[in-house]
Amino acid sequence: MSLSTEAKAQIIAEFGRDANDSGSSEVQVALLTAQINHLQGHFSEHKKDHHSRRGLLRMVSQRRKLLDYLKRKNVTSYTALIGRLGLRR
């Protein structure tokens, strides 16, 4: 259920500060968003997979925490990121 190495590298290159930046909040939020979108497709086929749904809820919660942190520390980066990812806020 995880993302491929190529997909992760592409996300890191797009949202990171450099090619090796996998730990910044922006990259972590982008990776979590990609994983969440991937799992949503899984749940359209497997409606009773409650174990994976718990993992999805943990990812959504972690993304929310990272977005709250980013909003507190750097509002311009926060607004740019949610615009690029197409999140609701």
Swiss-Prot record:
It holds the Pfam family Ribosomal_S15. InterPro entries: Ribosomal_uS15 (IPR000589), Ribosomal_uS15_bac-type (IPR005290), uS15_NS1_RNA-bd_sf (IPR009068). GO terms for cellular component: cytosolic small ribosomal subunit. Keywords: Ribonucleoprotein, Ribosomal protein, RNA-binding, rRNA-binding. PROSITE patterns: RIBOSOMAL_S15. SUPFAM superfamilies: S15/NS1 RNA-binding domain. GO terms for molecular function: rRNA binding; structural constituent of ribosome. SMART domains: Ribosomal_S15 (SM01387). It comes from the Bacteria. One of its GO terms (biological process) is translation. Part of the 30S ribosomal subunit. Forms a bridge to the 50S subunit in the 70S ribosome, contacting the 23S rRNA. Belongs to the universal ribosomal protein uS15 family. NCBIfam families: S15_bact. One of the primary rRNA binding proteins, it binds directly to 16S rRNA where it helps nucleate assembly of the platform of the 30S subunit by binding and bridging several RNA helices of the 16S rRNA. Forms an intersubunit bridge (bridge B4) with the 23S rRNA of the 50S subunit in the ribosome. This is Small ribosomal subunit protein uS15. It comes from Photorhabdus luminescens. The lineage of its organism: Bacteria, Pseudomonadati, Pseudomonadota, Gammaproteobacteria, Enterobacterales. The gene is rpsO.
